[in-house]
Every structure is written in structure tokens, then in C-alpha cells.
Amino acid sequence: MESGHRFDAQTLHSFIQAVFRQMGSEEQEAKLVADHLIAANLAGHDSHGIGMIPSYVRSWSQGHLQINHHAKTVKESGAAVTLDGDRAFGQVVAHEAMALGIEKAHKHGIAAVALHNSHHIGRIGYWAEQCAAAGFVSIHFVSVVGIPMVAPFHGRDSRFGTNPFCVVFPRKDNFPLLLDYATSAIAFGKTRVAWHKGVPVPPGCLIDVNGVPTTNPAVMQESPLGALLTFAEHKGYALAAMCEILGGALSGGKTTHQETLQTSPDAILNCMTTIIINPELFGAPDCNAQTEAFAEWVKASPHDDDKPILLPGEWEVNTRRERQKQGIPLDAGSWQAICDAARQIGMPEETLQAFCQQLAS
């Protein structure tokens, strides 16, 4: 496959679903995982898209990822619930967690959902969008257990994960306002994408094993490993620390320290604490009008007419629209790794080649 090739999203979805069916996932599980990964690529976040498949296959083969498992209720009290993800596909248990939280928010006006011990839950904005589609605000604090990748402010090595923070606000007859980012300067997956492409990352994102700043993504992919830096120095570090506590400790899960370190970088375990709010719970009849007035006010001051001001989440909306028409781009290195993973789990070569022909057409 040539670099820069674009794949039809629907055909690619069928292939990804077939990969997980080959791995042993039941039909609904394979669909939910494929839905999520393709949606991440369509939204422009390739770091959380189908490029994760080789890591998932390795995690499963090492006994970390548990297929065909579901979230288990640990404690439930009114509007609050704590769930054990049972090391299942995060794309499954997070979907179940958000569905339960939405149900509680309909009933109580507000819900708090704590999920721990889940395998990688992917792009957090996807779960916020699930809440927004139901008309709800949601706030998400996420931690990554036992795989330190990010150095604290003034730190010399990695001490915690990329710990995403996410907020969504639904809008009437318009796309939701969505804030979703890792508290590291860039997501770990973006170093993987850059490494496969053979390109540097922006300055201010990485340090090498000696703590020296670098733009070489190999320091996050090849030993000896360096570390990501937090965004905005002490501000990103402080938010990352709160995500570690609210996402990890408060959810009933673990925080990252000497006793919780994982032996495999593919054993990605997430914890997430989510607050889901029905905006009608508040006495704010003018809320939508005020939101739109602010949006119009902000967008009306571009410095350059060729670079319009985007609202939070608008970049994803635009990228999704473009990729649905033009296809999902994938570099040759990532595609080769996905095909190798498919072979590793026993997908027949003729089946793989048949999909390749469909995708190339």
C-alpha cells in the first residue's frame, strides 16, 4: 500500500470487525470495537484508531485483554455506580458504563459512574458524544494504570500516564462543544503514528532517557525509553495529577506507583470517573441562547480569514465530514502492522488478501 492511501470507512469497518471475530470476539463485541476505532479515525484521531489493533492483539496473546467480558457492578447507590471493567475491551465496558449513566441521569437528573480495571477505553470524546447524543453534559477524568509515560513538571523520567480529561456540552440543532485531550503535550499514540511515518514530533513534547528535550518519536517506541511532557508545564501536570486521583483512586481502581507497574506496554488499563448531567436540572432557560451568542461572538474575530476560529469539537466535525467523503488515510507502516496482527491471530491469507483487494478498489 502506498503512503497516503485512503480507505473507505465502511469497508475498513468490515475488515476490522472480521479481525476481532477471528480473535474470538462475539459479534456484538467485534462491532463495538470496530465502531469505536473507525470513529476515532474519522474524527482525525488516528492515534486512537485502527492503529491500536496490533497492541490489542499483543495484549490478548499475553493474557491481559479479556475478550467477551462485561462490566460488573461493584456498588450502586441511587445516582452513583461503581463498575469493574474485568480487563474487558474498553470499547465494550465503557459503552455499558455510559449507557447505565445515561439511564441514571434520565432518572435522577445527574449520575456519577466510576469504571476501573478496564482495558484501553480509546478516544474519550467518543463516550462524551454518547452522552451528548442523549442531551447530557458529561465530564470525564481518566487515568492509565501502571504504564508511566509522562514526566511531572521538573521531573526527569515518566511517573504517570497520559491521563485524558474530557468535557462535552450538547447544543440544540448543532454539534456539541467537545473538549477532549491527553494531559501530555501529545498523546502517546501520536508518537507511534509519527514513528511509523518517520517524522519528528513538535518541540516541547518529549525528553529522552537522559531527560534531554528531543523531537524524535523513537524515544517512546524503542528502548531505552524517554518520556512525554505535560502540556502547559505545571498546569498540565496538575490536571494530570487530578485525573490520576479522580479517575484512578476514586473509581475504586489503582494509581500508578511502584507496586502497580505493568510488565507489558500493551497491558493498557484505564480507569474513568464520569459525571453526567441533565442541563434541564438547572434553572437556565436562556442557556442555549447564551451558548450560541458566545459561539458567534468568539468566531467573529479571526486574525486571518483563511484560518477561521473553530469551536471546541469543530475540528473533529470538519475532519469527519472530509474523511467520510475522501476515506481514512493510513500510512504503510501502520497498515503492515495491522495485517501482521491479523495473520498472528490466524486470519487465512486468502481472507486477508480479499479484504486488501476490496480496500484497494
Question: What spans do the regions from the language model cover?
Answer:
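A generic, well-ordered mixed alpha/beta core segment in the N-terminal half of proteins
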Residues: 80-172
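N-terminal glycine-rich anion-binding loops that anchor highly charged ligand groups
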Residues: 5-11, 25-51, 65-76, 266-269, ...
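N-terminal nucleophile
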Residues: 157-160, 167, 182, 238-270
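Secondary-shell segments that build the walls of catalytic and ion/ligand-binding clefts
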Residues: 196-258
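Active-site cofactor/substrate anionic-group-binding motifs, chiefly glycine-
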Residues: 48-102
